[in-house]
Each structure stands twice: as structure tokens, then as C-alpha cells.
């Protein structure tokens, strides 16, 4: 039981940290100067975690999406703008969906509520699912061919890269201290992965699965998420930007995409379809969205809706920096009774200022027959409100 408990905490905090994110898809337009991303749409539109996009084909996108407090797999059709769940796991959830080569089936990591983690193949037609690679706790898979997988797996308290032969049922350890981003390099027989052996500067490396040869491609500093265009140009996400880098031509990365959308913040996962015409990205919702979510929960006196956008270790200050209390449960204790016992509670928003990851609300608060002015400063990180300062 100690191992299960530790592993569950490790997975929850390291691999599947469920922030409030959305999946967006753009058209990639080639121009004389390079590329433009146009016609962006939010294909998830869901409160909670939506992430890990993968192009099933050029017109369908798989991704993991939260519903009923669990995470299932959605497939979104870009032609019809429709989506449907293709998994339904009441006592757990699925992550890291991918299409299995030369098959209509998909693979996904299944994480049960009790901490049990397995890697499954899902058959669309028969709805029969079977476990594959039972000897590894696969976290981030990437298919090389239908019989070969490069898998990032959990070993003790870190991530390790394995070359898995499904026919021979062998798993060969390749490297330790690995990042989550593993991809096939277009037009080659190579896979790329991120080595985190150097804590100050992570390296993007290539692996030849046939002879296990490893070479360094470039330094990524401390960037976690990458993908490839069909012409072997590397894309790297960082903050609200995506950068491009041609390992054969470029000395340094250059700007590929800069978001002007307030609802695209801290871009993480990125994926490109096979013909290079579509790009999917995962981004956090805007700080204003989080402030508005708790604002509406407050006026409804709904304690769960009010607390939802707050981080577990949220800190509450009195201006300028006097800590009053911290922790979500402390916040629940303070507000739950207040909501129940204050029938006339209402907050009116007078003015809102949004600056980077902060929201400043000027409010009129009515409670117990009295109305007063208030100012609240909300600071957000990783899709959650991490601190509130009252003036």
C-alpha cells in the first residue's frame, strides 16, 4: 500500500497535473516569410483538464478530457466540428492517447483511482480493450511502428526511456531522467527524446531504435514540450510562444507563433498533423477566466464552485504582504459557514484590470445589510489562483 500511495502522488504531481487547460487547433499557412497560424478554434471548451492532443489522422484529433472528475479520451472531427468520447472509465481515467500504426485502434495510459497504472489498446468497433506492455508503468508512449514502441516509463521515482519490442515482449532500458516529449523525426528512422540529466540545460537527443545509437540534436534549456513539422523543423513551446529550429541550418531558434489571444497562456503540449497543415496546442485559460469563475461561485454562495479555481496551497494576504492564512481547506472553513449564513451576500464588480498573470477587481460587497468597497488582487500560476491579496 505504501508503494501505491507514493506512486499515486508521484503521478498526480509530476505527470498528470490537472490544471485548467484547453486544446486549440490552428491552420498552418505557409508564407513568403515563413509561417502563420490562422483560424484558431478551441476544440475542448471544457472546464478542467484538456490536454495531450494527437492527430489520429489529418482531420481528427485525439485528446484527454475531464468529465465527472475523471479523464477520458475524446476524438474531435475538424471537418464537422463534432466530438465524442471514445472511452468511459468510471473508476479511473485515460491519458496519452495515440493511434497504433497500421491500425484503427488507439493506445492510452489508464490510471485507476487506486493508483494502478496500465497501458491499453482500445478497439473502436468491438470495444474490447487489452493490456499491452504489462511489465512497465508506461507514462508517455510513442509508436515507432506497430511492433515497436519508445516508452517513457515510471521507474522508482523518475522517468526512464525504454525500447519495447511487442513481438518479442522485451523492454530495453535506453536512458534515465527523461522528459515527457517523445516523437518520430519526420523522413527518418529516428525518434527524438529529452534528456534531463543536466538539471540546468535539457538536451534534445535522437535515438535509432534499430541499433540503439543516441546523438545530441540541440539544447532546449529547460523547455519540456516539442514537436516536428514534416520538413524536419523542430517546434518548441515556451510561455505564450512557439519557436522553430532547423537543426541542419539554424544556430538559434526563431519565432514561429505569438499568441494575441487572452485565452492562450503558457502553451505546453503541441502536435502537428502528418501533412503539416494543422497544429494543436494546449494552453491555460486566462487569469480573468479564473477570477470570474470564483466571482460567480461567490455570488451563488456555492462553496465548491467558488473554490474550484484556487490552488491547493493558495495563500491569502492583507495588503501589502501580511499572510492571513493558506491552504484550500482553510479557505473552505472560512467561507462555507459565511455562505450558508449570509442570505443577502452579493458582490458587484465595479472595475477589473488584467495584467499578465494578475487580476485586480474593484468591488462593492453587500453582506448582512451593509455594503462596502473592496479591492482583491488575484495571482495565477499553472491555471490556478495561487494567491489573493485584499486591500
Stretch-by-stretch model annotation:
Residues 1-20:
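Bacterial Sec-dependent N-terminal signal peptides
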Residues 332-391:
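A beta-strand edge to alpha-helix "cap/lid" segment located at domain peripheries
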Residues 286-302, 309:
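Short, aromatic-enriched amphipathic alpha-helices that serve as compact interaction elements
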Residues 65, 110, 283, 310, ...:
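Short beta-strand segments enriched in hydrophobic/aromatic residues
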Residues 18-289:
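Sequence signature of WD/YWTD-type beta-propeller architectures
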Residues 303-352:
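A solvent-exposed, acidic/Ser-Thr-rich amphipathic alpha-helical stretch
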